[in-house]
């Protein structure tokens, strides 16, 4: 394994980007405005069984119905990304696709800052998705949008089996997405990369909760809010057997981010940019402190907004501008 770089005498200050206007997606995000349900139903007829009229008289789906959300995601992936076959086992996270796409578009902009403003595209760009999950959503969107080569890593064999089935069912993904198991559940980056392997960026949506009980309470609260507190509403059965690693880890998000910061320094020579979503605002400052201690050369904080949800993307690198320029010359030319 390459040796960690020497710590800079004075860590560079974080470059903070103002969050976008509330509800505003990235300009390249395909999911602007209202959903075109007739077009979605055309590519995925089963969606028609789940379309309802919302209180504003517009077509929608019941986002508190897991079956409806899964079929809706399937239609979005088919309509916008050409993914014709997508399914996940019951009990796994069904991600909001517009928000996942926003993360990837912001990462593309990040790489462009080291490439004279041009987004580097194609299979020569390698991305490592930490916690790819059963849905494989980041590699699917990232490969379809930018042609990047993805490594999807997870600790759960069942999640990887689901992701492999998705990739195998869509021939256009062949060679563009590979999946690896992290054999040590206590590690994040360590043990995943070969000694001579280089990765241009990493991404992660870390587990938020600190325990299974906390995750259960949080999910129950979410379902009740979606159901508008209707006492007659039957809540879905919450099964966390398959998705425990997606929802919680000891110490919650903060502990995971601390470990990620520490491990990133140990593989710093192999990665250009590391990144992670951060759900809890107070954890951003904590992460900045851990990264300064680890010797990060630069940290960037990007605000993102989808509907009512505000989130943060934190990216960091152990390479200064000169080293990033050398990386570009050796890998992107």
Swiss-Prot record:
Q: Which domain of life is it from?
A: Bacteria
Q: Where is the composition biased (Basic residues)?
A: 1-10
Which keywords has UniProt assigned to this entry?
Answer: Cytoplasm, Methyltransferase, rRNA processing, S-adenosyl-L-methionine, Transferase
Provide the catalytic activity annotation: adenosine(1618) in 23S rRNA + S-adenosyl-L-methionine = N(6)-methyladenosine(1618) in 23S rRNA + S-adenosyl-L-homocysteine + H(+)
Q: Where is this region: Disordered?
A: 1-31
- Localization per record: Cytoplasm
Q: Give one GO term, molecular function aspect.
A: 23S rRNA (adenine(1618)-N(6))-methyltransferase activity
In which residue ranges is the amino acid composition biased (Low complexity)?
12-22
Q: What is its main location?
A: cytoplasm
Gene Ontology biological-process entries: rRNA base methylation
Q: List cellular component terms (GO).
A: cytoplasm
Q: Which SUPFAM superfamilies match?
A: S-adenosyl-L-methionine-dependent methyltransferases
Q: What is its EC number?
A: 2.1.1.181
Q: HAMAP family this protein is in?
A: 23SrRNA_methyltr_F (MF_01848)
Q: What does this protein do?
A: Specifically methylates the adenine in position 1618 of 23S rRNA.
The UniProt entry's sequence similarity note says:
Belongs to the methyltransferase superfamily. METTL16/RlmF family.
The identity of this protein, by name, is Ribosomal RNA large subunit methyltransferase F
User: What organism is this sequence from?
Assistant: Ectopseudomonas mendocina (strain ymp) (Pseudomonas mendocina)
């Amino acid at each position: 394994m390459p040796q960690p770089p020497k710590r800079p005498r004075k860590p560079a200050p974080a470059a903070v980007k103002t969050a976008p206007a509330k509800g505003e997606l990235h300009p390249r995000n395909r999911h602007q405005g209202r959903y075109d349900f007739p077009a979605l139903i055309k590519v995925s007829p089963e969606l028609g069984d789940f379309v309802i009229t919302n209180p504003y008289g517009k077509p929608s789906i019941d986002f508190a119905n897991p079956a409806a959300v899964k079929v809706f995601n399937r239609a979005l992936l088919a309509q916008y990304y050409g993914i014709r076959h997508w399914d996940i086992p019951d009990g796994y996270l069904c991600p909001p696709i517009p928000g996942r796409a926003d993360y990837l578009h912001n990462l593309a902009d990040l790489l462009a800052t080291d490439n004279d403003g041009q987004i580097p595209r194609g299979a020569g760009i390698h991305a490592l998705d930490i916690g790819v999950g059963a849905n494989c959503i980041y590699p699917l969107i990232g490969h379809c949008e930018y042609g990047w080569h993805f490594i999807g890593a997870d600790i759960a064999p069942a999640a990887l089996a689901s992701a492999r089935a998705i990739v195998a069912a869509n021939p256009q993904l062949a060679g563009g997405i590979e999946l690896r198991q992290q054999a040590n559940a206590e590690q994040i980056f360590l043990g995943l990369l070969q000694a001579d392997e280089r990765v241009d960026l990493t991404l992660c949506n870390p587990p938020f909760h600190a325990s299974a009980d906390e995750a259960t309470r949080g999910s129950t609260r979410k379902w009740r809010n979606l159901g508008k507190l209707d006492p007659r509403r039957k809540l879905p059965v919450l099964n966390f057997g398959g998705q425990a690693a997606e929802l919680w880890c000891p110490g919650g998000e903060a502990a995971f981010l601390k470990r990620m910061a520490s491990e990133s320094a140990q593989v710093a020579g192999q990665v250009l940019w590391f990144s992670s979503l951060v759900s809890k605002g107070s954890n951003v400052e904590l992460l900045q402190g851990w990264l300064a201690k680890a010797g990060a050369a630069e940290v960037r904080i990007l605000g993102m907004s989808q509907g009512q949800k505000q989130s943060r993307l934190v990216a960091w690198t152990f390479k200064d501008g000169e080293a990033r320029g050398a990386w570009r010359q050796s890998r992107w030319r």
